[in-house]
Amino acid sequence: MDYTFYKDLYFDLKNFTDEQLKTHYHKYGSWEGRICNKEMMQYKINKNKIISNNKNSYINNYIPKTTPKKINILIRTSNRPNCFSHNIDSILKQNYHNLNLFISYDNDFTKEYILNQLNDKNLNFKIIQVKSNNNQYHYNDYCNHLLKEVNDGYIIFLDDDDKFNHDNALKYINDYLTDDIFLVWDYFRADKIIGPKKGQIKKGNITSCGFCYNSKYKSFWPSEINADYTFINNLLKNNNLKVGKLNKILTSSINLNTIYGQGKREDI
């Protein structure tokens, strides 16, 4: 077991001693599918790439069956131009034209690289200024500002550290979009594949970029841990929505060498 690796990979373990890390892994981490060294990480990544390729092979030559519906992609980015570049590249590869991007920025540097990367691209986009604060989870509120900009169509969140995992992902998603369905799929993270089983959404088995829904349904992102689950749970509870599951791995982390979304803000 590599104690430094284990602690660096999982934000909730950052203050643990080596002895505490050892105890945690044997009592909880191994059962939760956590990774405790680089060799195990590479094994998991290679295994999950095979699973992803097999699951997604059906849509390699996918021919859409329905007219492209309007999809709004909401992106939070801050001080990560390289991540953002990979994120946008995965959107461009979709070749899906009924698309709007809403992108938040909280400083001038971020605004500059957004505009530099998008101004020569054939994309409909709008940038929205947001303000950071001292709350540890203030970035969740950025989603609320982005949501206010959407007037119609469907919504997908795709932060700057995430990307589409297949070039036909949006075409495939579009064919299953209906007003009363909250559509979910699987997500490829560094240490595991995440997604609800049989459409049963629970804390820890859903990610912010693992679903799509009609924008007429409303919910709110709280500034707290597991805000994506809270947002989804309230959305489903307060609206007459059914959960639909696509058995495909349609989004993934941009960097499979770490786990983002746990207070980690480094670029690639």
Regions from the PLM with identified roles:
Residues 1-49:
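Charge-rich, low-complexity intrinsically disordered regions
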Residues 44-90:
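N-proximal low-complexity "stem/linker" segments adjacent to membrane-targeting elements
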Residues 89-98:
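Short, acidic, metal-binding catalytic loop of nucleotide-sugar glycosyltransferases
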Residues 133-150:
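Glycine-rich, basic loop-to-helix element that forms the pyrophosphate-binding segment
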Residues 153-163:
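Short beta-strand-to-loop acidic/aromatic patch adjacent to the donor-nucleotide binding site
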Residues 162-175:
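Acidic donor-binding/catalytic loop of UDP-sugar-dependent glycosyltransferases
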Residues 183-196:
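Short beta-strand-to-loop element that shapes/binds the nucleotide-sugar donor at the catalytic cleft/hinge
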Residues 200-267:
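Conserved nucleotide-sugar donor-binding catalytic segment
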